[in-house]
Amino acid sequence: MKTLTQIISPIAAELQQFEAFFGQTLKAETEPMNSIMRYVLDSRGKRLRPILVLLSAKLFGEINEQTLRAATFVEMIHSATLIHDDVVDDDDQRRGHASVKAQFGNLSAVLAGDYLLAKAMLLIANDTDILNEMLRTTVAMSEGELMQLSGLNDYLEIITRKTALLMRSCCVIGAMSVGAAEEQIQRISDFGLHFGQLFQMRDDILDADSPENVKMAMELLPVYQQETLKLLEFFPECEIRKALKDLSVFCATRDL
């Protein structure tokens, strides 16, 4: 199986541009917020959501400044939700490092998450279609998290709201940023939703926190992987479609 670095090679240059823009955007005018933002940058994950934005944009056009803003916006939203989740779940570890909550305390973590959310909105305020897409998704994510905390047992609904809708929105706003046609946006939206569902199913299998969820995920994952790959057949053959296919297989079979 290809490594993630190999898979995303068609957008390697654009991903570097994203990293520079993301780092610049996170800078705060005061301490200690700037120190917390540097810590967030140093604790980076796979950047899967910006990768989806960039790949979806490049599938339909040329990556531009609006694409980079959209990718930065979505990573800021994602980072904020992780920081807040660690406060809610009382988790001291995130991506092999101390969580923001463990490193700086609950109050600072809540404020850091709020800072990221507010700054993300400022970044994309003039791109109203992208902003509205992400606001609807953020509402659904909050509802999904509360459904899980409340002990509700609708597995597919919870993972769709908690994870898959954000992945879907990444694909949608990437396509929007290059002026993709409505039908193209709908096609990549369908792909993104299924991709997000299979990603979370694999996560649940690896975490093994809930035997019921593991059983459900193991039953559903092969079906959703097949359907996700099938949805890519609507797009012309190209290196970006191949990258999305390889990324889907990677996320469905990864060990981390």
Positions of predicted regions on the chain:
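All-alpha prenyltransferase/terpene-synthase fold signal
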Residues: 1-256
